[in-house]
Structures are given as structure tokens and as C-alpha cells.
Amino acid sequence: MPHVRSAAVNILVPSGYVNDPAGMAGMANVLSEMIQRGAGKLGNKELSLAMDAIGLDRNCSAGTNHLRIWGATLARNLERSLDLFSDIIQKPMLPKDELPAVKQLSAQEILSLEDEPRQKVLIALKQRHFGSPLGNDRRGTLEGIKAITHEGLKKFWKKHFRPNGTIISVAGNIEWKPLVDQVEKYFGKWKQSECAAPKQQKPEGGYLHLAKDTQQLQIGIAYPSVPFGHKDYYSAVGAVNVLSGGMSSRLFTEVREKRGLCYSVWASHQNFKEVAAILCYAGTTTQQAQQTLDVTLSELAKLSKGIKEEEVRRLKVGMKSSMLISEESSSARA
């Protein structure tokens, strides 16, 4: 991308929340914060200052299968960014005295969900549909956070932070050969190790009602779809776009615009390596809940009857536009 002056780095380490130890749900999320609190020869404050000194916009978070470390800066500071990230990944201090504060932050994040009923419903929906560990929430549980120890954290890092399974992507104003040399310089001595994949449990499925005394009501629906790599994957993604691809989509038009049944309604395609699902959400009132559910289910059922040429053209334009716009951003491409 010679037309930009920035560079973005995206590093995925195979240490996602599906690997959280039994009884310690939230371990990966806690670790994503702890590795930023000092690494290599730099303590917590010094590490933050070093990254700020090169204008490194960064983030670290636990995903499903991977822990993601991301950063964007001026292209001339790329090598320094790789240097700092390599220490965060391979030489984190994991200071014991910082763990209580990090655990407290994680617990507060879980407790804050009580004020976000939409999030609570979606978390329960994924757990019910996918089962453990795929359907687990990255935040973990209060019991799991409480059970995390410093020794357990170090063991988790040592076991799951490994080069085999790690993905490093870089985009921006870069030159290939120097980049390869820099990655080799900072990550070349990282030793491989083996780790068994977590065993997926059978999901419960069925219906679940979460009682809460409120005037609002949240509806979540999930049903199986096809994962990336399947011959019908793009057809499934296209179908979701017809349902929920903007203000002209079917759900928005039929549920919200025509009938005024809810303040929010959408559908999305949730994709994992071997399984996938279409998730639907509607936020409405207790008085209009049944009609909202009925109309939403009706629109889902209508998909089997096909879509119009106009809808096909619209979703193609939307998907192409999204891809082209993202190509102009080094962060999005990384």
C-alpha cells in the first residue's frame, strides 16, 4: 500500500477463551490485560510510554480461538512495534501485584452486563446454541475470575503462547523482504510446543427464558448455518444481508418500519472453523413481544422462497463497497 504512510500489525496467538481451564472461565481475558503490564526490560509504565512514543495505537483482546494483539502506527515505526509486541508475547512480566486489580476489572466488566440486557441475551443465546467452549463468553464468570491464581496464569501463558498456530499479518507502506527479516529477528527464536484442542460439548439448544422486571423485552433466535469454506457460505452470508443489510433490509422494513414493533432488529452470521449459525435479535416491549417474534419468524421462513433480483443487486453492491472501502485502510487489511 505505497499510497499510505501507516502500517498495521495484527498478531493472533492460539490462546482464545475456548482454552480457559475448567473452573477458571475468563483466564484468556485476564491474560490479555496482564501481558500489557510490563514486558522484556520495560515495566508497566515504561512499556506504555515506549508505545506512546511511537504513536502506536494498540489493542489486546481475547477472542474465541486466538488472543489478538493489534497495532497501527507510522510505517517508519513498524520495526519498533514488532520489537515491543514480541516482548509482550514472548517475555511478559505478568507482575503478581497487578493481578488483583486486573481481576477486579474483569469482575466489573461481568457485573456491568446487568445493565445491558441485550448483551445478556446474546451471551445466553450463544451458550445455548453452540455449547461449551465455543459458546462461552470471553469475559468468563465471577467464580472463574475469583479462582484464577498467578501460578495458573503463568502456566496458561506458557502452554498456549506458541508460534505454531500463531498468525502475523502486516499491511500498509511496507517492503516485503525487510519485513520478513524483521519478523525473523524478533520472533525467529520462539520455540514451538504442542497443545491439544479443547473438547467441544454438545449444546443444549431449545428455549430459555431469562426473567427480569423491566418494560423492555429482548428476543434472541439462533439456527445452524454453514461455515466458511462450505460451497453455500456466500449464499448464507448473502441471505443474512437480505435480512439485515441496512434500512432497506427485510427485517428493518417489516418489523420496525412498517409495524413499529421494535427499536432494534437485526441478523448476523456467526462463523467458526467447523460450525456456524445465523443469530437474530429484536428489542421490543412486553406488549409487542409476541407480534415481534411472529413477524421475525415469518421473515426468516420467507427466505426459503427465494429473493428478488433487486435484493441480489443491492447486496452485491453493499458487499463490494464494504470490501473496497476496507482495502483503503491498513488496519482493516491487516
Listing of model-derived features with the role each one plays in the protein:
Residues 46-198, 209, 227, 257-334:
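Charge-rich, well-structured scaffold segments of protease-associated domains
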